[in-house]
């Protein structure tokens, strides 16, 4: 059975302000105070695992140990069937330029790799999000969300971020980047993982 969250403060093990604000909004009905890693002056631990859950566990447990607070972290990315699950945990790395991240470059890399393999259409892919809630005593709970879909080229849409302009979610004919934010947030991998987290740990 999932361990319930019964504290009054939850540390979000991220330096991403957007993720912090999103979680604060989602947990507002439960009266939980949310603090971020930057607020607690926590360094970003090195992500050395080759799975989403492994990297999420590293971040959550490091934050819980350092602060004595329950800590929630996430690791997410896109897996492409014809590329044997790549880029996977290296989703963001594919965009690294040494001068910031360039996701147009990353999407082009994915498309070129598919073309090189003459991958058939539809080119199936999944966005994946793994949330880990860790307690200072070493216990953790894992929640995973998946958004299945396929990739298109050329890219479409100006909203969203990352690989959104090339990803069409299952059951739709528009990319994540062509959707309203509220519409994407209802069906995204992150939304599905958060829904499981809230239901499991808050009974919401």
Swiss-Prot record:
Any one Gene Ontology cellular component term annotated for this protein: cytosol
How is the subunit organization of this protein annotated in UniProt? Answer: Homodimer.
Name what cofactor the protein needs: Mg(2+)
The UniProt record gives the binding positions of substrate as 14-19, 76, 161-164, 184, 189-190
User: CDD domains, per this entry?
Assistant: HAM1 (cd00515)
Keyword list (alphabetical) reads: Hydrolase, Magnesium, Metal-binding, Nucleotide metabolism, Nucleotide-binding
Species this chain originates from: Ruegeria pomeroyi (strain ATCC 700808 / DSM 15171 / DSS-3) (Silicibacter pomeroyi)
Which reactions is this enzyme annotated as catalysing?
XTP + H2O = XMP + diphosphate + H(+); dITP + H2O = dIMP + diphosphate + H(+); ITP + H2O = IMP + diphosphate + H(+)
Q: EC number(s) of the enzyme? A: 3.6.1.66
Enzyme class, first EC level, given as a word = hydrolase
Q: Which residues form the active site?
A: 75
PANTHER family to which the protein is assigned, alphabetical: INOSINE TRIPHOSPHATE PYROPHOSPHATASE (PTHR11067:SF9), INOSINE TRIPHOSPHATE PYROPHOSPHATASE/HAM1 PROTEIN (PTHR11067)
As for family, the record states: Belongs to the HAM1 NTPase family.
Q: Which Pfam families match?
A: Ham1p_like
GO BP term, example: nucleotide metabolic process
Q: Which InterPro entries match?
A: dITP/XTP_pyrophosphatase (IPR020922), ITPase-like_fam (IPR029001), RdgB/HAM1 (IPR002637)
Entry protein name: dITP/XTP pyrophosphatase
Record: residues binding Mg(2+): 46, 75
Q: How is the cofactor bound?
A: Binds 1 Mg(2+) ion per subunit.
Q: Which GO terms describe its molecular function?
A: dITP diphosphatase activity; ITP diphosphatase activity; metal ion binding; nucleotide binding; ribonucleoside triphosphate phosphatase activity; XTP diphosphatase activity
What is its biological role? Pyrophosphatase that catalyzes the hydrolysis of nucleoside triphosphates to their monophosphate derivatives, with a high preference for the non-canonical purine nucleotides XTP (xanthosine triphosphate), dITP (deoxyinosine triphosphate) and ITP. Seems to function as a house-cleaning enzyme that removes non-canonical purine nucleotides from the nucleotide pool, thus preventing their incorporation into DNA/RNA and avoiding chromosomal lesions.
